[in-house]
């Protein structure tokens, strides 16, 4: 038995898709355990770029079983569009399974998401308006529609009718918009049910049997540590649990079955949407990072905010997820900078703190305390061994290891599978 949880350690967009794709080669089962189509993964395989939002990145390996776990909220329309996209790209998807316990994103979830975000005015939290939050709200309220309900005509009809009455009251009386039509939604979603029925499974059982058989299981997280509902920069967070603990509840597996936790972390920092960002660079340096790193969201196309590496965030991610290894991404983007800065603390109210603050009020007031190190000018996109990196790049990696007390096991020097420096085995 070997199982690895792969998580994002910053605000998402760290490059998890590439690392999942890289590790999936040795895995037998790849499991997505939280989030929805608000997440985006970009994977480059055999020179081709694939953009995925819901289906695990391991789908690009035909012999791997991929599972959408119970912790995921599924928009069936998006799922079928993604399956069609992969089919057009000649990718076989016959080994995809969907948890019967996963919750379904409904049209009223998407509509309410947009209306609620727009009503916040200057207090927007940066939602993607894809219905993720409202779907998780219904899950918590115990009125959600699960995949198992969707494929049961009687259950689906009853739950949809009950929910739609409540949602239409909200839409008409609070937001002043037209109500949604029951028959139209029922017909549309019944059609989806027929198409996905053969993919539905008891995913927890599938994972359990795989582990008992000694197979290798990779749990793929979406978003990142600082977007976690409990441990992120609340309220600028997602509605699920991207940290390692989320894999247990979102996939139906006990914590003693997890062997390693790999934290995916960029060699610099990015953030999409609202909220504090101490190392943000609103200047030419930040713009250079954005252009060199192609920092535009896979899901939204929004330009990502860019800044220097923040060791405070990295240490915090290690603490809340028990990270055993880092996968350091986009080291090549830093080539050409004469000096590189690392945030090693925060200055707030004339005091320097060295732990990530819980209060957003304090976090917003934080100014970065930087350590400046030498940069490198060489193109490193073709380097395959750590010892062949420029000394300054090696020193940068080692300094991150020192500051986080965590080994950097994988280093990405480009988007391709082959552009990965391996310093130790994960599986």
From Swiss-Prot:
Mg(2+) binds at residues 13, 40. GO terms for biological process: 'de novo' AMP biosynthetic process; IMP metabolic process. Keywords: Cytoplasm, GTP-binding, Ligase, Magnesium, Metal-binding, Nucleotide-binding, Purine biosynthesis. Its cofactor is Mg(2+). It comes from the Bacteria. GTP binds at residues 12-18, 40-42, 304, 330-332, 412-414. The keyword Cell membrane does not apply. Pathway: Purine metabolism; AMP biosynthesis via de novo pathway; AMP from IMP: step 1/2. Its EC number is 6.3.4.4. The active site is at residues 13, 41. The keyword Metal-binding applies. Substrate binds at residues 298-304. This is Adenylosuccinate synthetase. It comes from Desulfitobacterium hafniense (strain Y51). The lineage of its organism: Bacteria, Bacillati, Bacillota, Clostridia, Eubacteriales. The gene is purA.
